C-alpha cells in the first residue's frame, strides 16, 4: 500500500512538472518538488528554492499574446490544483479501503471532499481569475478499531495527506471531532498541538467536541492551508 502511494504521487509530480508554470523542472531536485514550487508562488510561505516569479524583462508583449500567456498560466495552475484534489481523493479512498475487511462497526467511512474558489492574480497582467482548489476532506474513524493494523494504515494515509498539503501550501490542519460522551469517559485523547513535516512545515492538530457525533467515532478532517497571492 505504501509503495502504491509513492508510485501514485510520483506520477502526479511528473505530470505537474510537465505543466509547470515556470521552468521549475530544470534539475532533479527541482523536479522532485515541482508541484510544491508551483503552489509556493500563490501561498503565504514561498519556497526560496523555487526562484522568483516569471518576468517579461521589460519587453512589450502584444495584447493578444499577453492574454494567451495569461490564460495558459491560469490553465496550468488549475491543472496542478486538480491533481492535488485527485491525489487527496486517492488517499481518502486508501484510508477507507484499508479497513474494509474489518467488521462493519470497525470500518472507516469517507465523508465529503470539498473544494473552494480561490482568487489568483496574474503577476504579469494584473488580471484576477477564480480557480478551484482543494479545501478539505473527512473520514470517520471508529474507536473500536484502534490498535489494529488496518486502523494504523488508514491513519498513515490521512497523515501522509496532511504532510503533503503542508509542504505544498505552507501549512495544514488535522481537525479531530470527538463525541461528547467519549470525551467525558476519557476514551479519547483530547490534546491539541503542532507537528512539522520533514521540510519544516507546520501541521496543526486540533481537537473539538461535537455533541452530534455518534459515540465511538472520531471524525478526522484534513484541511489545506490557504492559497493567496500572484502567479
Region locations from a protein language model:
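C-terminal motif of bacterial Sec signal peptides marking the signal peptidase cleavage site
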Residues: 21-24
